[in-house]
Amino acid sequence: MGSLGAILKHPDDFYPLLKLKIAARHAEKQIPSEPHWAFCYSMLHKVSRSFGLVIQQLGPQLRDAVCIFYLVLRALDTVEDDTSISTEVKVPIVMAFHCHIYDNDWHFSCGTKEYKVLMDEFHHVSNAFLDLGSSYKEAIEDITMRMGAGMAKFICKEVETIDDYDEYCHYVAGLVGLGLSKLFHASGAEDLATDSLSNSMGLFLQKTNIIRDYLEDINEIPKSRMFWPRQIWSKYVDKLEDLKYEENSGKAVQCLNDMVTNALLHVEDCLKYMSDLRDPAIFRFCAIPQIMAIGTLALCYNNIQVFRGVVKMRRGLTAKVIDRTNTMSDVYGTFFDFSCMLKSKVDNNDPNATKTLSRLEAIQKICKNSGALTTKRKSYIIENESGYNSTLIIILFIILAILYAYLSSNLPNSL
């Protein structure tokens, strides 16, 4: 759960955090008994706890398909991300990955921590994949093949232009959007979304991750991962790694703001995609990551800490997003809130200020025109008073102690 200091600063985070903790424990108890499916769902919770929670709400067949789709692409991404693997070894693997998923003897040791376990024990994923219906398998194979080919192209090529950037993000994330749309359609729950809208859903998430993960990627050993396009960063520095040096702080923030402004291009498509969804579980599955993305961009914008350490939404705010996101009205309200937060940070002296403000105002107009911005809704940007009396602190301590005792008493004996 969130740290005590964060909870005391934001006490209204407590209930959503409690609900999230209970939901996480419930999800862990829902892991299937079959060995290959048990491995897959267990691994899903390890590589993405929040994704693992949201996926549990999908119908059984679709849930299984999305779980395997995610793990297959996570494994493919693990190969691509491992900078210790030579190009000569890496390219053939990613190119043939769509074939490996049919081979329950195949595995390839790479990555670290839980990702290494995923790769070493990949036969479990293959066995689960083979259990899926044919329409699900065909969709997963097709997207894996196309993604592997795209990754192979950019293993041998740098991201030079904004077009390159969009193409790379299409291969590694836009295709995920296309694949999920195919799975939703195959389940019978949704109409097939257009490729353009599906692609934008993936690009918005991927560009947010690329922005947020600058420092981690540039410091990767033995070789940096560089995804920011030269067409953008070369306006501010001579080399991409120069952005992390303190003497370039001013230019670094301007470059960061340029990158965020580029990512905002996809928001209108994302709102349209989500507004077309009919199934409540699929809607939540799609909407929660998009809200996390706009929230992360609001935190990153004009924030030098992107080049100094980790910038991410606090766990309590994440819990609120998961708890409150149920309808399209919730999405419009949240996008409006975070776009207001972002807008308040725009410096009129920033070289891209006019463009940034124009894109934010377009987003806000869509949200306002939706009719969802009622006075009764809860805002994400109204901060709580930071000072609390000792009685409230004592009460929170007691509640936390009771909760800890309850959860501890219900832990499985093996833990």
Swiss-Prot record:
Obligatory cofactor(s): Mg(2+); Mn(2+)
PROSITE patterns: SQUALEN_PHYTOEN_SYN_1 (PS01044), SQUALEN_PHYTOEN_SYN_2 (PS01045)
Subcellular compartments: Endoplasmic reticulum membrane
Disulfide topology: none
Stored NCBIfam families: squal_synth
PANTHER family: FARNESYL-DIPHOSPHATE FARNESYLTRANSFERASE, SQUALENE SYNTHASE
The protein, known as: Squalene synthase 3
UniProt source species: Panax ginseng
Gene it is expressed from: SS3
